[in-house]
């Protein structure tokens, strides 16, 4: 009887001790599958970071996978981002045609319904009309026009946003190489003191001159190829200036590039300009150094477009030089 009680007691103690050891091991083992509170916090915020904007700090994905934007399609594509939605006129950008094959027109202003359908994890906008509504769909960054003032700032800004800083630097290196090649190709062809002007005619007959950071090929001509502005247009703060016909000779250049904003293709404003005595008497008109550029091609100012414009401008000048020698 005593032996049976002793055996029972020993067996019971072994079971109790085993249970206690298992319980202790479950709460203290460093290899336990259950995360600690700190680990849970890390897991919840994994893949997100803070990005400072004028509207405050926004939590965005470290590597966004699906981005919707209004006017920053080219900027984001230049650093390899996956753009799934853009505003409609971006599709007219000839430099982005192949890159936008999988993207959707999300309207302008951006349609919240169309944006929601794209399931973005990041939204980047130039205009902030629907900012609050868009912010409820995905983290939204408002980057106002003019935040970056040249191609280098632009590419690095959007490389940061897209989590692609290395690709941004690769793009810049390729851009610098192309710009250097373009300058080399123009040596001995273009007088180093020659001036180059960018002009635009509207369908209302208004004539404008542009600086180095307002599209129309400005960054390609002035920043990449290092060509000179007309002497009266050397003020950096004057990115656009409306000209009267009386002012035009003062702002004329040795080489002049004209784009025409004429959405209905009437052609009336251009005919009137070309028939004017002032236009006919310009040095560029007489010397055949006046170029008429496609609006959709040269209006663009994203990094991909600027890079493409370098080749177009160099080819234009080289061909023009050959023609003038005949």
Regions found by a protein language model. Give the residues of each.
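Alpha-helical, coiled-coil/dimerization segments enriched in small aliphatic residues
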Residues: 90-94, 208-240
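Extracytoplasmic ligand-binding site segments that recognize negatively charged/polar headgroups
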Residues: 144-157, 193-219, 263-269
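Structured C-terminal subdomain patch of bacterial secreted/periplasmic proteins
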Residues: 255-326
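Bacterial Sec-exported substrate-binding components of ABC uptake systems
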Residues: 2-11, 22-69, 167-198, 266-269, ...
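Charged, glycine-enriched surface loops/patches
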Residues: 69, 132-169, 176, 191, ...
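Short helix-initiation/N-cap motifs at beta->coil->alpha
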Residues: 53, 104-112, 235-244
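A short, structured surface patch at a secondary-structure boundary
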Residues: 68-118
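Proline-aspartate-enriched helix->loop->beta-strand connector
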Residues: 115-125, 139, 248, 252-256
């Amino acid at each position: 009887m005593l032996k049976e009680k002793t055996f029972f007691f020993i067996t019971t103690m072994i079971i109790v001790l085993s249970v206690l050891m298992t319980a202790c091991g479950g709460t203290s083992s460093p290899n336990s599958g259950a995360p600690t509170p700190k680990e849970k916090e890390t897991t919840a915020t994994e893949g997100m970071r803070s990005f400072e904007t004028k509207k405050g700090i926004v939590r965005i994905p470290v590597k966004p996978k699906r981005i919707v934007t209004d006017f920053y399609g080219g900027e984001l594509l230049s650093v390899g981002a996956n753009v799934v939605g853009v505003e409609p006129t971006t599709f007219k950008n000839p430099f982005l045609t192949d890159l936008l094959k999988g993207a959707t027109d999300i309207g302008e202003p951006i349609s919240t319904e169309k944006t929601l359908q794209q399931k973005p994890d990041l939204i980047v906008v130039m205009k902030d009309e629907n900012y609050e509504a868009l912010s409820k769909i995905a983290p939204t960054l408002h980057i106002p026009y003019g935040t970056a003032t040249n191609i280098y700032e632009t590419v690095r800004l959007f490389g940061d946003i897209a989590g692609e800083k290395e690709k941004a630097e690769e793009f810049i290196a390729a851009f610098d190489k192309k710009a250097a090649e373009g300058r080399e190709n123009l040596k001995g062809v273009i007088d180093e003191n020659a001036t180059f002007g960018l002009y635009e005619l509207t369908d209302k007959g208004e004539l404008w001159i542009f600086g180095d950071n307002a599209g129309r090929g400005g960054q390609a001509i002035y920043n990449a190829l290092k060509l000179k502005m007309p002497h009266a247009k050397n003020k950096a703060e004057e990115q656009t200036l409306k000209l009267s016909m009386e002012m035009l000779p003062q702002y004329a250049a040795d080489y002049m590039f004209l784009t025409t904003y004429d959405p209905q293709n009437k052609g009336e404003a251009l005919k009137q300009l070309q028939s004017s005595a002032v236009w006919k008497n310009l040095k560029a008109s007489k010397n055949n150094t006046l170029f008429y550029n496609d609006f959709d091609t040269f209006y663009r100012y994203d990094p991909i477009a600027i890079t493409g414009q370098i080749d177009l401008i160099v080819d234009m000048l080289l061909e023009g030089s050959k023609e003038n020698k005949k």
